[in-house]
Design a protein with these regions (language model features):
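N-terminal, post-signal peptide beta-strand-biased segments of exported outer-membrane/organellar beta-barrel
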Residues: 1-71, 385-388
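Outer-membrane beta-barrel porins/channels
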Residues: 48-489
């Protein structure tokens, strides 16, 4: 039968970070204790909605078409504190600010597809999606790349970019090798997000006056959307042009799955066909009506190793220096503001099944999965949960038939589910370990000099602090509630 489905996941993703101050970190941050430990901070636990709508239309016994609007199953918006209280109740700049303070956006993939039974019991499908994305991220950087600086030296940066064409292609097949066993395979390729936009800056945002009294009179705002980059200085006129100065590129991994499904019919296929024949109708398999239960095992792969970095670029000179000024201070926006990730491919195992308690009326289901870690400890971050994960889910479907004619397929289906994911901790607590440095507004730390477009004489990358800001322990937990409604006809 044909059907239209509307559903939404409600995602609660909780992330916490217990930062450790690097041994060579010379910044003056009163939040760190004598052992370099910062207070544990967590994101706000806010529900993120992930709605989906789709439909399939049966053209004939062999051909069907479908359309779908779906977003990635991710944690969505994240809000971290700009300021936290120390042991005396005094508000200070938050310890995770160099990694993330805000994350929000919209990524949607309208998709159309077609499926055809090319041979008896062999079905193939192909789909094409046209995605678009609007992304907002905020974090802190340091202005002067030097020692002995306080949070007064920090700049709050708010990046906003968009990409209105992200092509996606997927293909799959399903072979019913016996009346009780199906095997299937699926592959998906998605182009990288290649977004354009601008960045807004706020200097002196993390001062004690703003933290403790909300006094933002010293905050200097700028934005690369303006011709003078928002500095208000005549000498900067034209440096930011007409905007669109930020270029962001993020690879989206290829994915593939193979699976096998066993289903136990209530009656044999021959008997089901015999029962359908007197009514003059052909037999069409309906798992909720015809099966007692099913169980499925899937193996999954995601090419996350394609994500070496979140690539963030701004206009620069031929020598690698940033060309865009920051309002209120003597520094510039780095031409190369990439955020390293160096992910690994992810492999997973998923198992689940349905048990039809009431034929053609009520099904209960359960499943579980495990996936390997994508992230490496050296590059750990609080934006995406990239550690090993184990999860389970429970749910069910209740069908309400419309009309009393058994030959008709019209029905309403109500679906609900709950899932929980356990994440392994990401931990790197050696204060002498390497990690991800913060961005800086001047090229090299201390007395180091520029030796190349992206290097300083001390061997470090330009426009980066001399110390990492991601050391510590990151924990994650996720709960997902799913509700849906379908009409089949």
């Amino acid at each position: 039968p044909s059907r239209v489905t509307l559903q939404s996941s409600i995602i609660f993703h909780h992330t916490c970070f217990s930062r450790i101050k690097a041994a060579n970190d010379t910044s003056l941050d009163p939040l760190a204790d004598g052992a370099g430990r910062f207070p544990r901070v967590c994101n706000d636990i806010e529900p993120a909605l992930n709605p989906q709508i789709g439909g399939t239309l049966r053209i004939n016994d062999r051909l069907g078409i479908g359309a779908l609007i779906i977003g990635p199953s991710a944690s969505g918006e994240k809000n971290w504190p700009d300021f936290v209280e120390d042991g005396n109740g005094t508000r200070r700049a938050s310890p995770q600010r160099y990694l993330l303070t805000r994350q929000s956006g919209l990524i949607v993939f309208p998709t159309i597809g077609v499926g055809y039974e090319v041979l008896s019991n062999l079905r193939l499908g192909l789909s094409f999606g046209w995605g678009f994305a609007k992304i907002k991220n905020a974090a802190a950087t340091v202005a002067l790349n030097s020692s002995g600086q306080t949070s007064d030296n920090d700049v709050r940066a708010n990046l906003q970019v968009r990409d209105y064409f992200i092509p996606r292609v997927s293909a799959g097949g399903l072979w019913s090798i016996t009346p009780n066993v199906d095997v299937a395979g699926w592959y998906q390729w998605t182009d990288a997000v290649k977004a354009r936009g601008d960045v807004g800056t706020a200097t002196s945002f993390y001062t004690a006056a703003n933290a403790q009294r909300g006094d933002d009179s010293r905050v200097g705002y700028g934005d690369t959307i303006f011709s003078d980059c928002g500095t208000g200085r005549p000498q900067d006129e034209g440096k930011c042009g007409s905007g669109d100065n930020a270029k962001v590129k993020l690879a989206l991994p290829m994915e593939a799955k193979i699976g096998i499904r066993y289903h136990r019919p209530r009656v044999s296929l021959e008997e089901a066909q015999r029962q359908a024949a007197p009514g003059g109708k052909s037999f069409r398999r309906d798992p909720l009506a015809n099966d007692l239960f099913d169980i499925e095992l899937d193996l999954t792969w995601a090419n996350n190793s394609a994500i070496d970095a979140l690539e963030i670029r701004f206009p620069g000179t031929s020598t690698g220096a940033g060309r865009l000024p920051v309002s209120g201070i003597n520094s510039e926006i780095p031409a190369r503001a990439d955020q390293p990730r160096h992910y690994r491919d992810v492999f997973g195992i998923r198992v689940g099944g349905d048990y039809n308690v009431l034929p053609d009326q009520l099904a209960l289901r359960a499943g579980a999965y495990i996936e390997t870690a994508a992230g490496r400890e050296q590059f750990q971050h609080i934006d995406f949960a990239a550690s090993q994960r184990i999860g389970f889910a429970l749910g069910g479907t209740y069908r309400i038939r419309l009309g009393k004619d058994p030959a008709r397929t019209d029905a309403i289906e109500i679906m609900a589910g709950y899932g929980h994911t356990f994440f392994a901790d990401q931990s790197r607590t050696d204060r002498n370990a390497s990690g991800v440095p913060a961005l800086a507004g001047t090229s090299c730390y201390g007395d180091a000099t520029v030796t190349g477009p992206n290097r300083c004489s001390d061997g470090r990358e330009r426009y980066r602090t001399a110390w990492p800001v991601n050391l510590g322990t990151i924990t994650n937990a996720m709960n997902v509630i799913n509700v849906g409604l379908a009409y089949r006809f």
